[in-house]
Structures are given as structure tokens and as C-alpha cells.
Design a protein with these regions (language model features):
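RNA-binding basic/glycine-rich loop and surface signature characteristic of RAMP-family CRISPR effectors
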Residues: 1-283
């Protein structure tokens, strides 16, 4: 008998590193009739957090859930009260015309919370596994058939600290690296829900292979003035990290090194670092 119930199951994954989103995002596929295939993403991206608790806050505002830009893609169903019957388009139009009403695709949401202030987020790129997939079959990332398929498509047999692996060909790496650097630096906001829209502009980018130098380069300092302590944001270029400061940063932090091409320079530096790594001869 067919059960009339819906339930959430595991998202389908091809476990195929020839797809760039799979290669960079990783995968996990667990089936009851076979082994579990799992690849961890070489990218670790933290949540945004306040530079200092005193430099951020939570506010209340009214927002609208707006779907009025494409009414044909977001139809509104209208039913008679106490009935499951849907009104036809002609009946809806007649009602609106007779009663001088409109049928909005906006939902008014009151007392919504939003955060404001100075925030930071960390991104770690594991170059050892960025373009390498393991061929280990004890904790497999790939099926044996997929391993042979990758070899036929030019993937290079190599070895890294985690064991034997296959490396994406250089021409493909050279295509992905600029796109990855661009995506990490030039992220986009696609939501239109906030009535008090903020660009959330990037003020500074710090790049280093030393994790300790990153939080030291973009930080805050607590100034205790008795009853009213304050936090001062600081951009420090002497911590060992390469710091790229944008023009808007000068409005919030005292600096003399802001540059109109800061984000372009940061993107180019990421490209240089990723291209300089020897993916094929790690050992």
C-alpha cells in the first residue's frame, strides 16, 4: 500500500569532483546497501561575528516579505471563507474592482530583529586538498569506477600528507582559481527584504598563512573609562598578515593606507598564493 506521507531524506549527491561545486563544497552519500562516501570541503567559512561586543548591537525594525516584482511567478490563492474552493482569476479581478482593493504580494512583518555594527568572518583554504581527492578505499571519497574515470580524464596520480590522491589537471585549476578568489572577495547580497537596506561593504581584508596573525590584524581594543568602557576598532599592518584596506574603512577606523584598488589587490594576491602551491608534488 502506498503511504501518503512525506519525509525528509538525504540530498542526492553525485560524489563527482569534476563538478566544481562538488570539488570545493565536498559531499556525503550514505546508502543502506553500500559504503558511505564523504569528502570534506577544503574551505572552512566561519559565521560573521562582532569585532567586539561594544561595536555591534541588535535593533528592532519592521520589514516586508516582498514578492511583487514577479507576480506571475508568485500567484496568490484566494479562497472563500470557510471553504476550500479557490476563486478564479475572473472572480478575483471582479472582487478587487467592485471593492476598490488590491491584492498585494507583500507580507508586513513587525518587530523584526537585525544586527548592526562592525563584523568579521574567517575563511581558511586547505591547499593540500583544494584540488586533490583521496583514492583511499578504507574511508572512501570516490568509488573505484569514478577513480578510473578521473584518470581517463587527465587527473594526475600523486600523494599528499593524507595519502594517495588524484589531482585536478593544471588547465582546470587555472580556470577555477580566479573564479574562487573573486567569489571569496566579491560576495554579493541578493536579499531585498530589509526596509533599511545596508550594503555591508567590506572594510578590510587580511591574508596570511599564519592563523594567529589574522585576528591580530583586524581587532578591537577595550578602553576602560570607568562607567562607560569603549571599544576602538584597529587595523594593524604590522602583525605579519597582508592587509588590504578599502576606502569606506576610513569612515570607521583611523587609517592612512586605504586604497581604491584594495579588493582587486586582495583578489590578485589570493590568485598568486593558490597558483604558487605545488598541488602535484606535495611530498
Amino acid at each position: 500500500m502506498l503511504k501518503k506521507k512525506l519525509g525528509y531524506k538525504e540530498p542526492w549527491s553525485p560524489c563527482d569532483p569534476m563538478y566544481v561545486d562538488q570539488l570545493l563544497g565536498g559531499w556525503m552519500k550514505a546508502s543502506g546497501d553500500g559504503p558511505t562516501f564523504k569528502r570534506r570541503s577544503p574551505l572552512s567559512i566561519s559565521a560573521m561575528r562582532a569585532v567586539h561586543p561594544l561595536l555591534a548591537g541588535v535593533y528592532m525594525e519592521n520589514i516586508s516579505f516582498d514578492r511583487s516584482d514577479r507576480p506571475d511567478y508568485h500567484p496568490v490563492n484566494v479562497r472563500l471563507e470557510g471553504s476550500d474552493k479557490l476563486l478564479t482569476e475572473e472572480e478575483i479581478e471582479k472582487y478587487l474592482y467592485d471593492n476598490n482593493r488590491t491584492l498585494s504580494r507583500r507580507d508586513w512583518i513587525q518587530n523584526n530583529k537585525r544586527a548592526s555594527g562592525l563584523f568579521v568572518a574567517d575563511v581558511a583554504i586547505d591547499l593540500r586538498t583544494l584540488f586533490c581527492v583521496s583514492v583511499n578505499q578504507h574511508e572512501p571519497e570516490l568509488t573505484k569506477e569514478k577513480i578510473e574515470e578521473l584518470k581517463e580524464n587527465g587527473w594526475i596520480e600523486s600523494e599528499n600528507i593524507f595519502g594517495r590522491c588524484l589531482v585536478l589537471p593544471k588547465d582546470k585549476r587555472d580556470e577555477i582559481i580566479p573564479a574562487l578568489a573573486h567569489g571569496l572577495i566579491n560576495w554579493r547580497i541578493t536579499s531585498n527584504q530589509s526596509r533599511t537596506f545596508s550594503l555591508m561593504e567590506t572594510l578590510a581584508v587580511a591574508i596570511s598563512d599564519n592563523a594567529s596573525s589574522i585576528p591580530a590584524s583586524i581587532r578591537a581594543k577595550l578602553v576602560d573609562n570607568g562607567e562607560n568602557p569603549k571599544a576602538i576598532p584597529i587595523i594593524d599592518e604590522a602583525t605579519g598578515a597582508e592587509v588590504f584596506v578599502t576606502l569606506p574603512c576610513a569612515a570607521y577606523i583611523q587609517t592612512e593606507s586605504e586604497n581604491v584598488d584594495a579588493l582587486k589587490n586582495a583578489e590578485q594576491r589570493l590568485i598568486e598564493l593558490m597558483r604558487a602551491f605545488d598541488y602535484e608534488k606535495q611530498l
